[in-house]
Swiss-Prot record:
This protein's domain notes: Consists of 3 domains; the N-terminus binds the ribosome, the middle domain has PPIase activity, while the C-terminus has intrinsic chaperone activity on its own.
SUPFAM superfamilies referenced in this protein's UniProt entry, alphabetically: FKBP-like (SSF54534), Triger factor/SurA peptide-binding domain-like (SSF109998), Trigger factor ribosome-binding domain (SSF102735)
UniProt-listed HAMAP family: Trigger_factor_Tig (MF_00303)
Family as reported in the entry's similarity comment: Belongs to the FKBP-type PPIase family. Tig subfamily.
GO CC, any one term: cytoplasm
Gene name for this UniProt entry: tig
Gene3D superfamilies per record: 3.10.50.40, Trigger factor ribosome-binding domain, Trigger factor, C-terminal domain
Molecular function in Gene Ontology: peptidyl-prolyl cis-trans isomerase activity; protein folding chaperone; ribosome binding
All residue ranges annotated as the PPIase FKBP-type domain in the record: 161-246
GO BP terms, alphabetized: 'de novo' cotranslational protein folding; cell division; chaperone-mediated protein folding; protein transport; protein unfolding
Functional summary from the UniProt entry: Involved in protein export. Acts as a chaperone by maintaining the newly synthesized protein in an open conformation. Functions as a peptidyl-prolyl cis-trans isomerase.
Reactions it catalyzes: [protein]-peptidylproline (omega=180) = [protein]-peptidylproline (omega=0)
Keyword Chaperone: yes
Protein name in the entry: Trigger factor
């Protein structure tokens, strides 16, 4: 076998592989003999038909099979001998097999880039420092109360935080428009659901009041026909309600799985959940900064095949997330939606992979155990979850991969320029939610 390697462009390589005629002819004869033994030919006993007839009837089939086998086997040998790492499946272009002649084919594919991660000392990380304070806990308890709040009619002017029920008809230049009419519409004032100025016009009104709301749709409004248009809404306020928060009673506490109904137990459980969420958010913040710095310090070419594969993965995840379409009903989401995210994933994967290989990072058993225990605390029976992971090798391997990634992040962090900054609980959590 002879192999020549050509760099066509960027990461693309073209192998021209030549297989000696003797090897090809022997493979064709073997294939024809096998076909002769298994195929029925009229007038001849199995395996007794003349070679000329076998070639005439099965020659094309034998050549096709031999070509496939030669391309697969010799391509693998060629990339091993030339130390190439394909980033995707090759495009094969074979010449026709001719008796007594060498068989030649080309294989075109992309390789992974060759690089060494550098510039770790230039990465800057602002490490947020935060704790769950008593006021944070109180706010979270209030949030739980609001989630279980009820509404009661009041004979009062509508104000921030109140809920109103109203009818309205919208018009532009005296003409009603689609989507501008509603009856029995519920709106919590101050929630920011409506376009600017709409809620402000309701403030101070009482049930039974009829009035006109005059607003202008934003220039970036989602409906093209309404962008920047001035509109009037003929409105009537049907009902004004105020929010009634439940007291921290035994009954209320039991709604959250605290069988004793003890308020302090609820607070302790909520604080524990908040601390777990905060720890994860702090970790994510640091990790995101480390990866951003790693990418900025190391500009590398990306194999198009690897990016395309990542786009397909993201597309399938999106379809599952938004309804799990069956069969041919799935919409073809454009690749552009996922291009940037796919490129980042591939780039980060290559860079982290180099850090892991160069530093020979292996999963630390203590780190693996810590990750499993941390995940288990989110479940009702942590011990059962831990045992499940310990008995499931596939799940364990997934955790080991997480541990290796964490250890790589820690190594980069140890070389980076790190400063600390005290931040509030809400700020950390809100940033984490926005990033997700």
């Amino acid at each position: 076998m002879q192999v020549s390697v050509e760099t066509t462009q960027g990461l693309e390589r073209r192998l021209t592989i030549t297989v000696p005629a003797a090897t090809v002819d022997a493979a064709v004869r073997k294939e024809l003999n096998g076909l002769a033994k298994t195929r029925r030919i009229d007038g001849f006993r199995p395996g007794k038909a003349p070679v000329a007839i076998i070639k005439k009837m099965f020659g094309a089939m034998a050549h096709a099979r031999v070509a496939d086998e030669m391309m697969q086997n010799n391509f693998i040998k060629a990339i091993i001998e030339n130390k190439l790492s394909p980033a995707g499946a090759p495009t094969m272009d074979p010449k026709e097999i001719q008796e007594g002649q060498d068989f030649e084919f080309t294989a075109t594919f992309e390789v992974y880039p060759e690089f060494e991660v550098a510039g770790l000392e230039t990465i800057k990380v602002e490490k947020p420092v935060a704790t769950v304070k008593d006021e944070d806990l109180a706010n979270m308890i209030d949030t739980l109360r609001k989630q279980h709040a009820t509404w009661a009619d009041v004979d009062a002017a509508a104000a921030d935080g109140m809920r109103v029920t109203m009818d309205f008809i919208g018009s532009i230049d005296g003409e009603e428009f689609d989507g501008g009419k509603a009856e029995g519409f519920n709106l919590v004032l101050g929630a920011g659901r409506m376009i600017p100025g709409f809620e402000d016009a309701i403030m101070g009104k009482k049930a039974g009041d009829e009035f006109t709301i005059e607003v202008t749709f934003p220039a970036d409004y989602h409906a093209e026909n309404l962008k920047g248009k001035a509109a009037k809404f003929a409105s009537k306020l049907i009902k004004v309600e105020e929010q009634i928060l439940p007291e921290l009673t035994e009954e209320f506490v039991k709604r959250f799985g605290i069988e004793s109904g003890n308020v302090e137990e609820l607070k302790a459980e909520v604080r524990k959940n908040m601390e777990r969420e905060l720890a994860q958010a702090l970790k994510n913040s640091v990790k995101e900064q480390v990866l951003n710095g790693l990418v900025e310090a190391n500009q590398i070419d990306l194999p198009k095949a690897a990016v395309a594969q990542e786009i397909d993965t993201l597309r399938q995840q999106a379809l599952q997330r938004f309804g799990g379409f069956q069969g041919g009903n799935a919409p073809e989401l454009p690749a552009e939606l996922f291009q940037a995210q796919a490129e980042r994933r591939v780039r980060v994967g290559l860079l982290l992979g180099d850090v892991i290989r160069t530093n020979e990072i292996k999963a630390d058993d203590a780190r693996v155990t810590s990750i499993i225990e941390s995940m288990a605390t989110a479940y009702e029976d942590p011990k059962e979850v831990i045992e499940y992971y310990q008995k499931n090798e596939q799940m364990l391997n997934g955790v080991r991969n997480l541990a290796v990634e964490d250890q790589a992040i820690d190594l980069i962090l140890s070389k980076a320029q790190v400063t600390e900054k005290e931040v509030a609980f809400d700020e950390v959590i809100n940033k984490s939610g926005a990033a997700a």
